[in-house]
Regions:
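Short C-terminal domain-edge/linker segments immediately following a structured domain
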Residues: 42-47, 75-78, 87-92
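Residues in well-ordered beta-strands of folded domains
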Residues: 14, 44, 82
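An amphipathic, aromatic/His-enriched active-site/gating alpha helix that lines ligand/cofactor pockets
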Residues: 62-87
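Short hydrophobic/aromatic beta-strand micro-patches
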Residues: 58-60
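Short S/T/G/P-rich N-terminal loop/turn motif that feeds into the first structured element of a domain
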Residues: 1-38, 86-94
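Residues that cap or initiate secondary-structure elements
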Residues: 19-21, 52, 63-65
Length: 94
């Protein structure tokens, strides 16, 4: 999930939000995407776990500070952030 030839890495952001509803989450994701694009940060993936009242986002950026700034600008305080995450989505055939 890294851009080759750059120092970008992936960050897992967690937001704990009671009463997550799809319409509100869609609005937040749209806002995060717009702010991230303007800041040269990529929002790669979002996951919602309603039973845990948690929204997860995976961002690619040059620094943790850039991700935190994007989240703040979008109006969402980061509850937890983990640097250097990697993900593999889907299976590859052999």
């Amino acid at each position: 999930m890294n851009d080759s030839g750059s120092a970008r890495q992936c960050f897992l952001v967690e937001w704990y939000q009671p009463d997550l509803v799809d319409s509100a989450v869609d609005t937040v994701i749209d806002r995060l995407s717009r702010v991230a694009a303007a800041a040269r940060v990529n929002l790669l993936l979002t996951l919602i776990s309603p039973s845990d009242e948690t929204l997860f986002g995976v961002f690619a950026a040059d620094s943790v500070d850039a991700v935190v700034a994007v989240c703040r600008q979008a109006g969402w305080h980061v509850d937890r952030i983990t640097a250097g995450v990697r993900a593999r989505i889907g299976a590859t055939g052999t």
